[in-house]
Structure formats: C-alpha cells, structure tokens
Amino acid sequence: MTYDVVVIGGGPSGLMAANTAAKNGAKTLLIEKGNKLGRKLAISGGGRCNVTNVLPDKELIDHIPGNGRFLYSAFSIFDNQAIIEFFENLGVALKEEDKGRMFPVSDSAQTVVQTLLRELDQQGVEKRLNTRVEAIHYGDEVHQIILPGKEKVETKCVVIAVGGKSVPKTGSEGDGYAWAKTAGHTITELYPTEVPLTSSEPFIRERVLQGISLRDVAITALKPNGKPIKTHRWDLLFTHQGISGPAALRLSQFVVKALKKFNVDELVVEIDCSPDEHEQALIDRLVKLAKESPNKSIKSVWKPLLPERFLLFLLERIRLSADTTFHHLEKKKVIEFAHEMKHFQVRVNGTLPIDKAFITGGGVSLK
C-alpha cells in the first residue's frame, strides 16, 4: 500500500499532523504502537489539557531557552490564535487562565482527544494501532516503513511524531531518534526537563518540609559564584526528594545544564517567598504586624504570610521562639526572618531521571 503521508505516533503532534495532511488532500496513514491514540494528551495539564497560550508570539518565544527563534517560521503558518480557532471551529470552547494558559471549558482533556479522533475519521485518515515500526528505509522519492512480519508500507512523506523518552507509560521510548539520525538529522544529548529537582539537604532527607506548598514564589538557580542563572515565578511543592511544582519544573533544565557546564555536584536555588516586596519593606511589615498585636505570639501574627509548618521551620532556623511577642522581639531577628523569606536557599544535586520528566530536552538539533 502506498500513501502520500505516513505519520508515526498517535500523540498530540501525530494527531494534528495526520489531520492536517488529510485535510489538505493527502492519503494519510497514522501508525501507533500502543492500543490507544492521544494517551499523553489525555493526561496533559493534570488531565485538563493546556491546549495553548494566548501570550504574544515574541513573549512566548522569549520564554523558550536556547534557539526559540526557530518557532517564528512555524508561527507564521500556524500560531496560537490558529490553534484556538481550530478547536473552537470543531466545537471545543476554550477559556483563559493564569499566565495566558488556555484550557477547554469542560476542564477535561478527553474533550480535546475525542474531538481530534472524530476529526481523523471525518478526514478519512487510516489508523493502525498496536503496530510497532521496525525500520524506515529512506529513498529519493518514496520511503518504506517496515512493520512486523516484514510488511512494507510505502509513502512519499513520513512524519516522525513519536515523542522523546519522557513519560514512557504513554509509549514514548525514544524510538524516533535513530530514524531521524538515519534521515540526516543531528541528534544532541538528551536530558530531562519539566522535572522535579532533587536535594540531599537534611531537611529534605528527613522530610521536614514534605508536602508544604508555597504559592506564587520566585525560585532562582544560582551559579557557583552566586550570580543568578534564571528565575521562574509560580508555585512550589517540597517533596521527600527535593522540590517540585510548576516553578521548579520550569527551572529544572537550567539546573541540569548548569551542573554540567560548571562541572559541579550541587547548585544552590534560592526561593523568594515575597517577590513583589523589597526586603526592607518586608521587615517593616513584619514589625508592623507584631506591633499591632503586641500580646500575640509572632507565630500567630505572621501566620498569614507562610504555611504554618514552613513558618515554624524558618523561626527554628534563626533560633527565634514561635511564642515570642512584640515586647520581646529583637529587631535583628526580624531582619534575619525577612532574609530567610527572601533568600531561602536549597542545595540541589540534579533532577529525577528522564523517565520521570514531562519533557525530553535535546534530541533533533534545530541549528
């Protein structure tokens, strides 16, 4: 059998590629080695599917590390607004949430998955599930896809959309890198990204902070000389292995690259629990809160600022009793506490492995 386009991989990219090819008149085959299409899409965004982002192209590209500029040509053909129109034309209403993120109004990724699957059927895309590609033989005009039992499928165009090596339970095992290399692409070193950070700090190993969430904080990776590498602002979660949550996940690739670049075993990340406030302003606010309720303990009057367990942890770090009242509160201790809130440091030694990451860094070179 000969096709105009064969798409290998039934994830988000594969579904979009197959739909687009068929919509433009190509006889299209979609091959998926698993028993279900859209498996990774169904779990994206916490099962809600973060479809796209409404921020301007330049702002989106500025947030992409490395050579983000390569997306300008792609965005000139199909950008975030085109994605929104694509889904809304198919009846999927979207809504905007924080940081420009777009989700289906249904709050269910299955809405997006089922819509794409229906579109595959309407566009006449042929589907082969439970079918593993064993090899690809590239020709000048026609390429051969080798399937189990030495079955051969011929195509004028092959789209490799099999994903990286992250979230292997969805079928992403890195099959495509060898095929891309054979086609002439340069493959760069793989690394985990969008992945929790790990730490051997005593308070991490002893699970003192496990389960504590910090909302809307800034986390910065520091060079060995103390200068900042990158800052991300969002939520954090302390775990039994280190730090997770959106801000830590976004920072992870910078930590991975810096550990390798500086050839060190550990880096410091610094957490600012009050990023909109200068340190002196925070000191003044802490004093004001204590002064307004002079007979209450600082544990009570400062409680709105931080989760209680984290508040008590910081007080213990600076050797300040949680029961101290304003009358016995030393200014130097307020200064120390404010400094901890603005510059809480955690030594990190890496990340969880690539199979625990949401995204694979590296791969096909874009240069």
Outline where the language-model segments fall.
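Beta1/beta-strand and adjacent pyrophosphate-binding region of the FAD-binding site
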Residues: 1-13
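Glycine-rich FAD pyrophosphate-binding loop
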Residues: 6, 22-46
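Short hydrophobic core segments
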Residues: 6-8, 133, 153-168, 180-181, ...
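An anion/pyrophosphate-binding glycine-rich loop and adjacent beta-alpha core
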Residues: 35-37, 42-43, 51, 57-58, ...
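Glycine-rich active-site loop/strand segments that organize a redox cofactor
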Residues: 48-96
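Feature captures the FAD/FMN-dependent oxidoreductase FAD-binding
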Residues: 77-157
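A glycine-rich dinucleotide-binding beta-alpha-beta segment and adjacent secondary-structure elements
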Residues: 129-130, 135, 312-367
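Glycine-rich loop(s) and the adjacent beta-strand/alpha-helix scaffold that form part
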Residues: 157-203
